[in-house]
């Protein structure tokens, strides 16, 4: 009686070798990809801080004073004359690439204001991906 099923397949050794090769490739490639994402987030944050700092300066030029908080760039604060905003289109643009709120400090360490991203962990300080990013650095 002829058999319709073939017993051809992979041996256990062949499967183990393939799994080991995939694991080695993942171990080599994954850190490189994760490092690129971290660099991209930091570069994106730097560009974002520069743009928002320009918006803060425009706010000052038009109103005669610096905003009390970054949200003032999006929504007109009460009692502010000559507000011609929004200077930033929407509130979500006031978050860093990690989804944390940006912080406006007045006065700043190196000027009348500074805008800070607290990095990946969203807390002051840190190293690497968690290091703070300031608009004047």
Which residue stretches match the model-derived regions?
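Flexible interhelical turns and helix-capping residues at alpha-helix boundaries
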Residues: 5, 38-41, 63
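Aliphatic-rich helix starts adjacent to a transmembrane/signal segment
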Residues: 32-51
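Alpha-helical hydrophobic helix detector
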Residues: 16-32
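Short amphipathic alpha-helical interaction patches enriched in hydrophobic/aromatic residues
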Residues: 29-33, 37, 56, 60
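Low-complexity, acidic interaction segments enriched in glycine
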Residues: 50, 54-137
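N-terminal leader/signal peptides at the extreme start of proteins
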Residues: 1-10
